């Protein structure tokens, strides 16, 4: 598509069920790859679009990470209900139903560091994971950020460890939040704080609830009981609008 131009026009019509938002991307420069993956007995198409500059990273990892994320999240919540999941290489991370935008590029010579690779894998897991929270379990992210970002970051942590049990997860492990929790009390806020008033937004809306859920699963309730309850929450509130009492 980069070799020639056409003056002809074409109309594409897309139809999606049970979505609350949408996005699309178009470029003559994008590389596309895809793979079918079995998610809880259903075939889903995992796809990636990326610029040539991102080829060394995205060609090797992106679509595989998309497929892995769908399987991991589906095992911990409900089966992924959509027919496709798409990762698009971009300047930063953002999520929409069935499509998300993620960062990470190789150097001009095609090499990349472990930090860049792991950052790309982590953001793809996180943004694809947003299909489940808040696109499927449709909480109000403007009112209760932790129900969206916190639960998603917790599932991201589990998916990262299932991808590689030595993955350097930044949010989820208990020891990673110690420095934040040692900060002066006037810089700490309850998780239930309204989204628009949160200071230290990343640690409070992402890391603190993710870490709390991890501790609840590993230390307090145990995996079997926690996993049953977490899956039941997702099942009950799929395509509905839960508030904090519904989770508790």
Residue ranges and their predicted role:
Residues 14, 49-248:
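Hydrophobic alpha-helical and helix-loop surface patches within well-folded domains
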Residues 1-64, 77, 121:
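Non-catalytic architectural context of zinc metalloproteases
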């Amino acid at each position: 598509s980069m070799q020639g131009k056409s003056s002809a026009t074409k109309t594409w019509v897309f139809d999606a069920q049970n979505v609350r938002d949408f996005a699309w991307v178009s470029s003559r420069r994008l590389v596309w790859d895809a793979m079918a993956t079995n998610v809880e007995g259903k075939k889903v198409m995992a796809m990636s679009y990326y610029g040539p500059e991102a080829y060394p990273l995205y060609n090797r990892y992106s679509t595989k990470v998309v497929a892995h994320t769908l399987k991991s999240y589906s095992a911990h919540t409900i089966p992924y209900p959509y027919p496709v999941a798409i990762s698009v290489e971009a300047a930063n991370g953002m999520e929409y139903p069935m499509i998300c935008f993620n960062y990470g590029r190789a150097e001009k010579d095609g090499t990349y560091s472990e930090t860049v690779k792991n950052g790309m894998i982590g953001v793809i897991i996180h943004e694809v994971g947003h299909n489940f929270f808040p696109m499927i379990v449709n909480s109000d992210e403007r009112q209760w950020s932790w129900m969206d970002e916190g639960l998603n970051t917790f599932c991201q942590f589990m998916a990262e460890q299932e991808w590689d049990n030595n993955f350097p997860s930044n949010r989820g492990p208990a020891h990673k939040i110690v420095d934040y929790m040692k900060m002066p009390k006037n810089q700490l806020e309850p998780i239930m704080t309204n989204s628009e008033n949160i200071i230290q937004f990343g640690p409070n809306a992402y890391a603190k609830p993710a870490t709390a859920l991890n501790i609840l699963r590993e230390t307090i309730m145990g995996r079997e009981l926690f996993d049953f309850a977490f899956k039941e929450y997702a099942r009950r509130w799929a395509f509905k609008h839960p508030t904090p009492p519904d989770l508790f």
